[in-house]
From Swiss-Prot:
GO CC, alphabetical: ribonucleoprotein complex; ribosome
Protein name, as recorded: Small ribosomal subunit protein eS24
BP-aspect Gene Ontology terms: translation
Record text on subunit structure and interactions: May be present in 2 copies per 70S ribosome. Part of the 30S ribosomal subunit, where it binds 16S rRNA at its canonical site at the bse of the body, as well as a possible second 50S binding site near 23S rRNA helix 45.
Pfam families according to UniProt: Ribosomal_S24e
Record keywords, A-Z: Ribonucleoprotein, Ribosomal protein, RNA-binding, rRNA-binding
GO MF annotation list: rRNA binding; structural constituent of ribosome
Family named by the database record: Belongs to the eukaryotic ribosomal protein eS24 family.
Encoding gene per record: rps24e
Length: 99
């Protein structure tokens, strides 16, 4: 798996970096969010506690997936802005009992 950064936008108003990337994974299935997040955090020297993978999109018959991630300046801002289901999906918060 190889990740290529296509664009990084600095959103100072919200306090985050917006990262657009492509994943090359010939002969392999679409990589998991956990694997992609780990590689992005290592590549860009980000904090794993404030980095969220918004989506990874794969296309039929292609070994290229496109993704979008957000890296926040603070955990408080991330918890305020991001929808709960995204935070649960990325493993940043626990799912509430009974849901």
């Amino acid at each position: 798996m190889e990740i290529r950064i296509k664009e990084i936008k600095e959103n100072k108003l919200i306090g985050r970096k917006e990262i657009y990337f492509e994943i090359y994974h010939p002969g392999e299935p679409t990589p998991s969010r956990k694997d992609v997040k780990g590689k992005l955090v290592a590549m860009l020297d980000l904090n794993p506690e404030t980095t969220v993978i918004q989506y990874i999109r794969s296309y039929f018959g292609s070994y290229i997936s496109k993704g979008y991630a957000k890296a926040y300046d603070s955990k408080e801002r991330m918890l305020y802005i991001e929808p709960e289901y995204i935070l649960i999906r990325d493993g940043l918060i626990e799912k509430k009992e009974g849901e």
